Amino acid sequence: PKEYLKLKTKLIRQSIHGDEEKVRQREAIFEEIQKRFYDQLPEDEQVAVEVLQAIDDVYVSENAEFGEGLIEEYFEQTMLRTEYSTNDLLLLYLYFLSLAVNAERDEVTLNKVCLTIVSQTNYDDTNYIHLLQRVLIGLVLYQLDIDYHEFIPEILSMLREIMIDIGDTSLKPTVDFIEAKYYLYGEKDKEKALQYYEKAINGAEFLNDMNFKNRVIEEKNKDFP
């Protein structure tokens, strides 16, 4: 149904930056989907809704148990694919978010996913692209988390390429912020890191995203006391 797709699009495109108002809005969307559409949806759409809900639950509660059942049931199939579907991307996001919350390392899966994901070429569907960007960002943040930098440059350049391709730079401050972290911790290049921090702060201000701007300033002050 058209209305359902509208709601799903909203859930996919909006990230939650720990903002309570957004969390409440998203909960309302999930409730509406459950009430009005869920029972009539085809199975793969039901799975998409469940995974989206689990991602939010894990993110907000910092408890990875919310995603365990879905990962157990579907993740193995995702790992066999060379072309990721929307649901595969959602599962990957859930998987690496859960690892990050549990502070677990899984380099084997990380390597396999990174090698597959950089060869994705399906840029036709805007929802898919938004999701791909979020997964790529999640993969970089996870690598920074576990101090493993092998795929970061490649993924960052892929993110920049996608932004140019689709003419949407709303994620640029996020990518600049991650680039700052990478230069600081991956390359030990403080000067470059500071440049990217400045870019991220100015970019967030330009987009009027004060929540993110303040978060970046906080991180910068931690990294450069």
Model feature map: region roles:
Residues 1-6, 80:
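Long, contiguous interaction/recruitment modules in multidomain scaffold/adaptor proteins
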Residues 3, 45, 84-90, 127-134, ...:
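Structural signature of alpha-solenoid helical repeat junctions
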Residues 9-13, 45-56, 92-97, 134-142, ...:
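"A position-specific structural signal for the A-helix of alpha-solenoid helical repeats
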Residues 15-34, 58-76, 103-117, 146-158, ...:
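Helix-turn-helix repeat elements of alpha-solenoid scaffolds
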Residues 32-46, 74-89, 118-129, 163-169:
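Flexible helix-coil transition and linker loops at the boundaries of alpha-helical arrays
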Residues 92-173, 182-185:
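Alpha-helical adaptor scaffolds
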Residues 156-225:
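Long, low-complexity regulatory tails in eukaryotic proteins
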